[in-house]
From Swiss-Prot:
Protein family membership: Belongs to the NiCoT transporter (TC 2.A.52) family. RcnA subfamily.
Protein name: Nickel/cobalt efflux system RcnA
Signal peptide (from-to): none
Induction (UniProt): By nickel and cobalt. Transcriptionally repressed by RcnR.
Periplasmic topological intervals: 1-12, 78-86, 206-218, 282-283
GO molecular function: monoatomic cation efflux transmembrane transporter activity; nickel cation transmembrane transporter activity
GO cellular component, one term: plasma membrane
Native source organism of the sequence: Escherichia coli O157:H7
Length: 283
C-alpha cells in the first residue's frame, strides 16, 4: 500500500487515468452490473441505439453518485463505515425497484396485447355489418383488401405500443418517446445503485491523502470505462433486435411473447438481489 500511495502523491495521473478507464471497462464485465437485465430490457422494449446509450449512461451516473455518497457519508458518520455495510441495503432497494419494473413490463405487454385483440374484434364486427349493405363481389374485394391492410396496420400498431410501453391510441394520449425515455432513465439509474468497493476504496485513499482532485479524476475515469462496457452491451442488444427484425419475418410474432420471458428474467434477478441483500442485513 505504501508504494501505491506514494505514486498517488506524486500525481502520476497520466498513468492512472488510462489504467482506471481500463479497470472500469473490465469491472463492467464482472457479474453484478445488471448487464443481462439491461440487455433484456432493451430487447423487451425494442429499444433504439440512442435509448441503449441512455440506459448505460444512466447506470454509470448513479453508480458514480453512489460511490461519492458512500465515501463522503462514511467519513462523516463513522471512521468504521465500510461499503460492505451499505451494499445490502442498496441491494434491497434495487430489488424492490427492479421487481416493480418487471411487473410493469409484464402488465404493459399483457395490456397492449389485450387492447390489440379488442380492437381486432371491434373492427371485424364493424366490417361484418358493413358487408351486409354491399353486393357479394364488392364485399369480397373490400374484405380482402381492407382486412389485409388492417391486419398489417394492427400488427404494426401493436408493436409500436409494445415498444413504447403503451396500450393503444399512443399519438392521442401520450408522447411515447418521452415516457419511454423516463422509464429507461429510471431503470438505468436503478441498475447502477450497487456500489463498487474498489472505486470507493480508491476515492477514500485519495481523500485521506488530501488528493481529492486526483481521486475524483480516477473515479470519473473508472466510471467512463464502466460506461463503455454497459453502453456496448445495450447497443449490441438494440442492433441485434433491429437486424433480426429485418432478416426474419417472424420476429414480430416472437416479440409479442418475448417480453413475458424478459420480465420473468428481470423479476428473478430482482428476487435474487432482494434475498441477497436481506441476508446481508440479517448478518
Amino acid at each position: 500500500m505504501t508504494e501505491f500511495t506514494t505514486l498517488l502523491q506524486q500525481g502520476n495521473a497520466w498513468f492512472f487515468i488510462p489504467s482506471a478507464i481500463l479497470l472500469g471497462a473490465l469491472h463492467g464485465l464482472e457479474p453484478g452490473h445488471s448487464k443481462t437485465m439491461m440487455a433484456a430490457f432493451i430487447i423487451a422494449i425494442k429499444g433504439t441505439i440512442k435509448q441503449a446509450v441512455m440506459l448505460g449512461l444512466a447506470a454509470t451516473i448513479s453508480h458514480t453518485a453512489v460511490v461519492w455518497l458512500i465515501a463522503f457519508g462514511g467519513m462523516v458518520i463513522s471512521k468504521r463505515f465500510t461499503a460492505q455495510s451499505a451494499e445490502p441495503w442498496l441491494q434491497l432497494i434495487s430489488a424492490v425497484i427492479i421487481i416493480s419494473t418487471a411487473f410493469w413490463m409484464f402488465w404493459r405487454t399483457w395490456r397492449g396485447e389485450r387492447n390489440w385483440l379488442e380492437n381486432m374484434h371491434e373492427h371485424h364486427h364493424h366490417d361484418h355489418e358493413h358487408h351486409q349493405d354491399h353486393d357479394h363481389d364488392h364485399d369480397h374485394d373490400h374484405d380482402h383488401e381492407h382486412h389485409h391492410h388492417h391486419e398489417h396496420g394492427d400488427n404494426e400498431e401493436y408493436q409500436d405500443a409494445h415498444a413504447r410501453a403503451h396500450a393503444n391510441d399512443i399519438k392521442r394520449r401520450f408522447d411515447g418517446r418521452e415516457v419511454t425515455n423516463w422509464q429507461i432513465l429510471l431503470f438505468g439509474l436503478t441498475g447502477g445503485l450497487i456500489p463498487c468497493p474498489a472505486a470507493i476504496t480508491v476515492l477514500l485513499i485519495c481523500i485521506q491523502l488530501k488528493a481529492l482532485t486526483l481521486g475524483a479524476t480516477l473515479v470519473v475515469s473508472f466510471s467512463i470505462g464502466l460506461a463503455l462496457t454497459l453502453v456496448t452491451v445495450g447497443v449490441g442488444a438494440a442492433i441485434s433486435v433491429q437486424q433480426v427484425a429485418k432478416r426474419w419475418s417472424g420476429f414480430n410474432t416472437l416479440a409479442k411473447r418475448a417480453p413475458y420471458f424478459s420480465s420473468l428474467l428481470i423479476g428473478l434477478v430482482g428476487v435474487y438481489m432482494g434475498v441477497h441483500g436481506f441476508m446481508g442485513i440479517m448478518r
